[in-house]
């Protein structure tokens, strides 16, 4: 293939990434509560660390609430600090 012959290649469409929406905003969104370990475990890694908001698409305000709830649940032994 010659290096100067690019005119006959099909044009690529740019990849449009879908905007993520915060799962805690909206009318029927779940409330962040430290007494709900099932909900909080969805936002923790398999090693027990809090997953960052750029991965979970949680807004900054709700990420702070989520981190606070996870830390409270850890203190009350509802969630583990680390998982081996």
Curated annotation (Swiss-Prot):
PROSITE patterns named in the record: RIBOSOMAL_S18 (PS00057)
Name of this chain's protein: Small ribosomal subunit protein bS18
Alphabetical GO biological process terms: translation
Organism this protein belongs to: Maricaulis maris (strain MCS10)
Family that this chain belongs to: Belongs to the bacterial ribosomal protein bS18 family.
Assembly with partners or alone: Part of the 30S ribosomal subunit. Forms a tight heterodimer with protein bS6.
One of the record's GO molecular function terms: structural constituent of ribosome
Alphabetized UniProt keyword annotations: Ribonucleoprotein, Ribosomal protein, RNA-binding, rRNA-binding
Cystine bridges: none
GO terms under cellular component: cytosolic small ribosomal subunit
Function as written in the Swiss-Prot or TrEMBL entry: Binds as a heterodimer with protein bS6 to the central domain of the 16S rRNA, where it helps stabilize the platform of the 30S subunit.
């Amino acid at each position: 293939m010659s290096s100067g012959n690019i005119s006959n290649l099909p044009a690529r469409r740019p990849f449009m990434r879908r905007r993520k929406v915060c799962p805690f905003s909206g009318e029927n969104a779940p409330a962040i509560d430290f007494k709900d370990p099932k909900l909080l475990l969805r936002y923790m890694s398999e090693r027990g660390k809090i997953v960052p908001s750029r991965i979970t698409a949680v807004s900054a305000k709700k990420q702070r609430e989520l981190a606070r709830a996870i830390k409270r649940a850890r203190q009350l032994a509802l969630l583990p600090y680390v998982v081996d």
